[in-house]
Amino acid sequence: MMTILQRTLLSALVAAAAASAQTVNCVVAVVNGQIITLADVEVVAAFGLGDPPGAEAGTDPRHAALDTLIDQKIVLDVARETRAVSKADVAAARLDLARRLGDKEFGTKLARFGLRPQDLDPYLEGRLLFERALALRFSSTIPVSVTEVERHYRDIYVPEQTRAGGPVQPLDKVAETIEARIRGERRAAQTGSWVRDLRKSADIQIKKDCLK
């Protein structure tokens, strides 16, 4: 008799194979009993849904896509309170993606995988849920002192603008922008640290041969 995991695995493979006829499918990872297929990884990579900030140019985008999908699963496992995204939100995300890529490129990528636009909805929904879970957990205001803003202006903003040959605005004109940048960087660091801690306690099995 098939176990629940085996039945889930079989169903996911069949569904992914139907949606991506040109991809030789296999299981790339199992995260807390949830599978990630090669088709999942390649779709997320192709449509730019798994590009982390600071990803190095020239690296295989599938690795970033796999990391994104793993992070989504482990975060949503613990963020039980974030479980609903409206159809309207998903549809809006799909339209935004199509606009970002352009109609021609969007259509080409869909054809490559044998997908309809709405077949992207599960990936978009997962991304929206993930982003909302992080926003909910790290929603409190991160304090930034005046001294930090002044230091960033002196040590980072002015040198950056000088190297780029751009105008150097006075501090009072860019203080809010600098404060937001510092806060964003700090929130990203906190988020990254939390997700790394979740990974340590998660059951993650990666099948490296599948990505070769």
Segments (PLM) and residue ranges:
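A short N-terminal beta->alpha junction/helix N-cap motif
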Residues: 31-32, 53, 57, 81
